[in-house]
Amino acid sequence: MDELGVKGFAYVIIRNEEKREWDIQVYVDPRERRKGIGTLLHQEIYKIVESENPSILVTGVRVDKENPAAFYERYGYKKWFGSPSMCYTGGVQPEVDIEFIPYEDKFYEQYAECRTECFYEIAVKNDFKPYVIPLNEKDKKTLSNKPIYVTLHNDQLVGAVTVEDGYLDHIMVSPAYQGKGYGKKITQFGINKALSKGATSIQLCYIEGNSKAENLYKLLGFETFQIMHVYREFMD
């Protein structure tokens, strides 16, 4: 910073204390780039986090506009995964012919099993650990406080969606019911539920390479507005 104002900044926050993962971000005003400011900021912020004995440094970069990935690659960061974000600004979707009810604790085991079946392959491919979240009271309590909606068939969980503050998350269909149009119906329900709660736009994201999810969301009117790539550097 000088008399003309802030030229750039950097910050670091703990991402996962148990795993000693830290998020690190460096930003330089576009008008001040290629002057070594980013390098100086990274050096200074690195000194701060180095004293905490980190295991992994993680940073997220937006690549659909300017792509600063090369800056981090110079310091040894490697791409971890990509996550496009999409936005829906359309109207109410056609009413679906399946019933949804709010999630309750009694669905926990079925929900956890469905979550594992739906996301295990993605977790392994992208090194999202733990690959399987074991049944535990902390997870159960977290889910009980989420605005999750489930649909059942003969008391068996078919699928679910979380609808929170205009954001759709964990859209999933049990493998036994996949390929039958449930993914579309669950997403349509999520859109309508978000709109009924007052949302004027609805967002979601997915992991890069999940073409089925991408195609479904585009079919329903979602448009990509941001693409983030996450990079990490192992320190141990």
Language-model segments: residues:
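Active-site rim helix/loop that mediates acceptor-substrate recognition in acyltransferases
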Residues: 1-3, 11, 123-160
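Conserved GNAT acetyl-CoA-binding A-motif
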Residues: 21, 49-63, 194-205
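A structural microfeature
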Residues: 8, 81-82, 159, 183, ...
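A short beta-loop-alpha structural element at the N-terminal edge
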Residues: 99-113
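Conserved donor-binding loop and adjoining core beta-sheet/short helix segment
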Residues: 1-45, 49-50, 61-63, 158-169
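Short glycine/proline-centered loop/turn elements that form peptide/ligand docking sites
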Residues: 183, 187, 210-213, 232-235
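Acyl-donor-binding surface of acyltransferase catalytic domains
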Residues: 30-98, 230-233
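Conserved acetyl-CoA-binding loop-helix of GNAT-fold acetyltransferases
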Residues: 34-47, 74, 173, 179-196, ...
